[in-house]
Structure formats: structure tokens, C-alpha cells
């Protein structure tokens, strides 16, 4: 495929400072990358190898400037509708990838850069602000707030300009993955450490929020689910290995005993926040611990449930229904050669793990949400094997309904990719030997089949909880291209939903056919039909977030960021959810000042005022 020719392309780069920012924004020593004159001229054409390479890399260009005082954004198309609710759209993601000493890190290891878009419907304006999350790692790596020296490896990176051999600073909590407003607090989360609390108006970092400590203080709400265990000798061996690993992981690599996942769930029916944590040693042992926490609107612990699953799994996202927590297990294994290379510092620490494709099915664990469900159901430690090998990426929704057998029908709407494509430290095309990302990894020849796509998992349980049928199919036959970041109207979480929205590929660019996404697809799961809105030219889009206004399931607006990388611009886009697929779906587009253009965000959150 032609995209394979992108990999060896390495054009010269020139560093220069940003233009002066607006008065109310704080400017650090900004650096951005541009092509040489020859490369820039070639990239002027939309669909060339050069344009594809530079557009892709500009999507992950560092932004060192912060906007401490909010500024109004200029409307470039349309207008803010009068029925748009007052509230704030928060977007988490990395802000910086390269330091001043020659190191470039994986996008997943970039320091958290929180963006805020505050809607004031009274005066029909949107105010923007942005700040780095002041984590302990950020304060160490940028002591004066201007210059940067990366000292932490992070799980996915190798420091070209920093200490490699003997560098045990692996757990680099960058608070860059997701953002949550709950119980009067705004939290930035990362896959493996404490959340950081941030002031919801000023975005000033308050400090780490000890969520697990808060839960441990109320352990009388904890219940341990029982399950059939392995032979006692095997279990004793795993227990001994865990006891040996914990002090090493904690004392040497500074890993917390439990790592909180960055993906959370909100149960609107019960008014609860649901979160899950894993044990640190689970990454290295063929056994997985999961602790689920449920908090009320005041951040008081309502319930805590613990499960031990006899499988070596990696979980990024998960689901829940009225009676179950649901894990779609991504099977992994320890990579011994990779582990040795990782310990030397010459390979990323994540190289110690590899996908385990030996089984051609996907384990689905239905974990009872209450002791009552556990008492009346199946052995939850035995997974339901979905008849398709897939790597679970993100979950849009899950729900359950009573069926004619006296049991339950469970449905999940999610994105998944192929084990054949998924590669831990090559995600986004990262290669620690080079300072540029390789677009061809995310645009592989078999990308249409291998990259994330939208699927439905359907499970039929009888009255005893036994699985009678499990199936996996595309969510829509009309849209078979890669798609991810599934979202729904949050009012319909944990109940039957009709619509799913996701970032998607239109396939309009020959050399970037699959990623980055350039469209939003709206799937009607009742009939499998699909409609979409696409940006034009050399532009990409991020995760869609639904803002409900009433008037039915699709009564509301879809927010997303458009990255016009060739023009060094970002726009906040407002779509009418009902009109996606028509010419007038675009309601408004607002421009972020050029000097504040930011790299691709990961996950966002809408909070009503």
C-alpha cells in the first residue's frame, strides 16, 4: 500500500518561537515544528505523501503556552443557538511531547493539558482557557514553567536525551487521559495513578485527590465476591509471587498498590459514579484483581466490590448494567525478551507485555454488582466467550432487559480492533528511534478490518444466569470504516439507546484513509443505518461529546474539536444531533487563537452549570 512509503520520510525541521499571544494568556518558550521550504511546498497539495506525513505529525505538535484567564472565542461560522445550555466542555489530553534536551515521548506520556470551553448562553459567547495539570512529574520536568527536561521514562517512551540505563522513573502520572466533574470536584485522570483535582473555573491544580484512600476509610461498604479458585498449590504460588512483586513495584518503580483506570461510568438512574482499580502486580501475573467503587453525589462511598479473575488481562474501558459490571478482557502475556530490554532502559517499559492471541474468542466477564445478584446467578469467574477475537478499546453503552427465558438480554455498543494490529508501544506510530510519528501504522493496508470499528456484543442469559447465545456483529453495515470514541446521550446510559455517535474515517484521503478521523458518524442501532458529518480539506476531528437539551434521544448537540493542522488552527464545532447527515448539521464553529492551537485531545466531559 502507498502509505508504507510514509515510514522512511524524515524531512528537516526548523524551530521558531510563536507570535505574541493575546494579553491575557501566559506565553512560555514556545516551539513548533515546520517543514523545510521544499517540504512545505510539497505539503501544499492536499493528498500527497508529504502532506500526509506533516499533517499527521502536526496533530501531535507541542503547545507550551497556557491561557490562564479565559478569552472569548470568535465565531467563524453560524451562531450559538439560543437553546444551548449553560455549562462547560472540558477536554483532557497531552500538551507537550518534546523537551529542550533531545527527548520526544509517546503521545500517551505527554503531560496533561486541560482545555475548557465555557458556554454563556445569555450573551451567546464561549470562553476558552487552558492550563497544564501541575502533577509531581510536571513540576520536576519543568521547574520554572518555561524550559523542559524529561526525567521520567513513562510506560510507553524511551528518553533519547535523558537517562536510559537504570532509570526507574516509569510511573509518570501525567493526568492526561480523561476528565470528570463530580461531587463539586473536577478531576483529571490517568491510567495508573491518583486523579488530580483542578479548580473548575480557573483550571488551577489543587493537587492529587486520594480517591482510593477515601474509599479505604469506609471499608465497611466492601464485599468480596467468591469464586472457584485454581488448585491450591497454583494459587499459593501466585500469592507468593504477588507478595514478592509488590514491594519491588512500589519501592523501586513507585507504582501504587492499586492503579485506578482512567475510564469511569455514571449511573444516572441511581445518581452514582462508578470507578474501578486493578492491583499493580496484575500486569505481570496470570491473575487479575478488580475493585469497583460506587460513590454518591457527595463522593461518599456507597458500595465497594472486589473480584479476582483467573486470567491475565489488560482493561482500558468497561461497562455496567443494573445488575452487573462488564469486562471485555484483552488477553496479554509477559514478554521475557521485551522485559529484559525494558529493564535496561533501551526499550519502553510496556515492551514487557505482549498481546496473547492464542484463543480465537474474547472473554466477557459479567461480575455481579450486588451480593444478591451473585447469590442467584452463574459462576462469574468463568467468562462468556464471545465468538470473535477482538481487542476492546472503548465502550459507548451497555444495558440489560428481561427476556422470554426469565433471564436477561445484555447488549454492549463498543469499539474494538484486531489483535493482529494492536501493538503497545507503536500506538500512534511512535518509534523511539525517531522524533517523528509514522502515519503508516495507523493506516495499515488491512486497516479497514484491523483498526477500531464499532460492534455490538449481544448476550442471552437464561433464568439461572447461563449463557444461551452470544454474538458479535457490526453496529452498522452502512459504515464499515474505522471508528472509535463511541458516545451516546448520557441520559440514556445503562438503558436501551437508539443512537451512537463516534469519530470515524471517511476514507477521502488516499494516504491517510483511516486515521486521524475526519468525520462524526451517527448510527441508528435499531436498523443499522448510518449518517455522518465530515470536515473538509486537511482537517481532523476528535472525540464527539453529546450535550442533551431534551426533545428525545437525539435532542441536543454534539461537540467536537476540529484540527485544521495545515493552517495551525483549532476550532470548536457544534453540530445539531438531529440533523447529522444533512447539509445544515453544522450549527457553529469557533476559532481558538492561532498561538493557542493545541494538539489532539483524548477524552472530554460536558458539565451543566
UniProtKB/Swiss-Prot annotation:
Cofactor: Fe(2+)
GO molecular function: 9-cis-beta-carotene 9',10'-cleavage oxygenase activity; 9-cis-epoxycarotenoid dioxygenase activity; metal ion binding; oxidoreductase activity, acting on single donors with incorporation of molecular oxygen, incorporation of two atoms of oxygen
InterPro entries the UniProt entry points to: Carotenoid_Oase (IPR004294)
Null mutant phenotype: Dwarf phenotype with increased branching and tiller number, and strong reduction of the root levels of strigolactones.
Induction record: By auxin.
Note: The branching phenotypes of the ccd7/max3 and ccd8b/max4 mutants can be rescued by exogenous treatment with the synthetic strigolactone analogs GR24 and 4BD.
UniProt-recorded name of the protein: Carotenoid cleavage dioxygenase 7, chloroplastic
Gene name tied to this protein: CCD7
Amino acid at each position: 500500500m502507498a502509505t508504507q512509503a510514509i515510514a522512511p520520510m524524515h524531512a528537516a525541521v526548523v524551530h521558531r518561537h510563536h507570535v505574541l499571544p493575546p494579553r491575557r494568556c501566559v506565553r512560555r518558550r514556545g516551539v513548533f515544528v515546520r517543514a523545510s521550504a521544499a517540504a512545505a511546498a510539497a505539503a501544499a497539495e492536499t493528498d500527497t505523501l508529504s502532506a500526509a506525513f506533516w499533517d499527521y505529525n502536526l496533530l501531535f505538535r507541542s503547545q507550551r503556552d497556557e491561557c490562564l484567564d479565559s478569552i472569548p472565542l470568535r465565531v467563524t461560522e453560524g451562531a450559538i443557538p439560543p437553546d444551548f445550555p449553560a455549562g462547560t466542555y472540558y477536554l483532557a489530553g497531552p500538551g507537550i511531547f518534546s523537551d529542550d534536551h533531545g527527548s520526544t515521548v509517546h503521545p500517551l506520556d505527554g503531560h496533561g493539558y486541560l482545555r475548557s470551553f465555557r458556554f454563556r448562553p445569555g450573551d451567546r459567547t464561549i470562553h476558552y482557557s487552558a492550563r497544564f495539570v501541575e502533577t509531581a512529574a510536571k513540576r520536576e520536568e519543568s521547574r520554572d514553567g518555561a524550559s523542559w527536561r524529561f526525567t521520567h521514562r513513562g510506560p510507553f517512551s524511551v528518553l533519547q536525551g535523558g537517562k536510559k540505563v537504570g532509570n526507574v522513573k516509569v510511573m509518570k502520572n501525567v493526568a492526561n487521559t480523561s476528565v470528570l466533574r463530580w461531587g463539586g470536584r473536577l478531576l483529571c485522570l490517568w491510567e495508573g495513578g491518583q486523579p488530580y483535582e483542578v479548580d473548575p473555573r480557573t483550571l488551577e491544580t489543587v493537587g492529587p485527590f486520594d480517591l482510593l484512600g477515601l474509599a479505604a476509610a469506609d471499608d465497611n461498604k466492601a464485599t468480596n465476591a467468591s469464586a472457584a479458585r485454581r488448585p491450591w498449590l497454583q494459587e499459593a504460588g501466585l500469592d507468593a509471587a504477588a507478595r514478592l512483586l509488590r514491594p519491588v513495584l512500589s519501592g523501586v518503580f513507585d507504582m501504587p498498590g492499586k492503579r485506578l483506570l482512567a475510564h469511569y461510568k455514571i449511573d444516572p438512574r441511581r445518581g452514582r459514579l462508578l470507578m474501578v482499580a486493578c492491583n499493580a502486580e496484575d500486569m505481570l501475573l496470570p491473575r487479575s484483581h478488580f475493585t469497583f467503587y460506587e460513590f454518591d453525589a457527595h463522593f461518599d462511598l456507597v458500595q465497594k466490590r472486589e473480584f479476582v479473575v483467573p486470567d491475565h488481562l489488560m482493561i482500558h474501558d468497561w461497562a455496567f448494567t443494573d445488575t452487573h459490571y462488564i469486562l471485555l478482557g484483552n488477553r496479554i502475556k509477559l514478554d521475557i525478551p521485551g522485559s529484559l530490554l525494558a529493564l535496561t532502559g533501551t526499550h519502553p517499559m510496556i515492551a514487557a507485555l505482549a498481546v496473547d492471541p492464542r484463543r480465537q474468542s474474547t472473554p466477557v466477564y459479567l461480575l455481579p454488582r450486588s451480593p444478591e445478584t451473585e447469590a442467584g446467578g452463574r459462576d462469574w469467574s468463568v467468562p462468556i466467550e464471545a465468538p470473535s477475537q477482538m481487542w476492546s478499546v472503548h465502550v459507548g453503552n451497555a444495558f440489560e432487559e428481561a427476556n422470554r427465558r426469565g433471564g436477561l438480554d445484555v447488549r454492549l455498543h463498543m469499539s474494538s480492533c484486531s489483535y493482529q494490529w494492536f501493538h503497545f508501544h507503536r500506538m500512534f506510530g511512535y518509534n523511539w528511534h525517531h522524533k517523528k510519528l509514522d502515519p503508516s501504522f495507523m493506516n495499515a493496508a488491512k486497516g479497514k478490518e484491523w483498526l477500531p470499528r464499532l460492534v455490538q456484543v449481544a448476550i442471552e442469559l437464561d433464568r439461572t444466569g447461563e449463557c444461551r447465545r452470544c454474538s458479535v456483529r457490526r453496529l452498522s453495515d452502512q459504515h464499515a470504516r474505522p471508528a472509535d470514541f463511541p458516545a451516546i446521550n448520557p441520559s440514556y446510559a445503562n438503558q436501551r439507546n437508539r443512537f451512537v455517535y463516534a469519530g470515524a474515517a471517511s476514507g477521502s484521503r488516499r494516504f491517510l484513509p483511516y486515521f486521524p478521523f475526519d468525520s462524526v458518524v451517527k448510527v441508528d442501532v435499531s436498523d443499522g443505518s448510518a449518517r455522518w458529518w465530515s470536515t473538509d480539506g486537511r482537517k481532523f476531528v476528535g472525540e464527539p461529546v453529546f450535550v442533551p437539551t431534551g426533545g428525545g434521544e437525539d435532542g441536543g448537540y454534539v461537540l467536537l474539536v476540529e484540527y485544521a493542522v495545515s493552517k495551525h488552527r483549532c476550532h470548536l464545532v457544534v453540530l445539531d444531533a438531529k440533523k447529522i447527515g444533512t447539509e445544515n448539521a453544522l450549527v457553529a464553529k469557533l476559532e481558538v487563537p492561532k498561538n493557542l492551537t493545541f494538539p489532539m485531545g483524548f477524552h472530554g466531559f460536558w458539565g451543566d452549570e
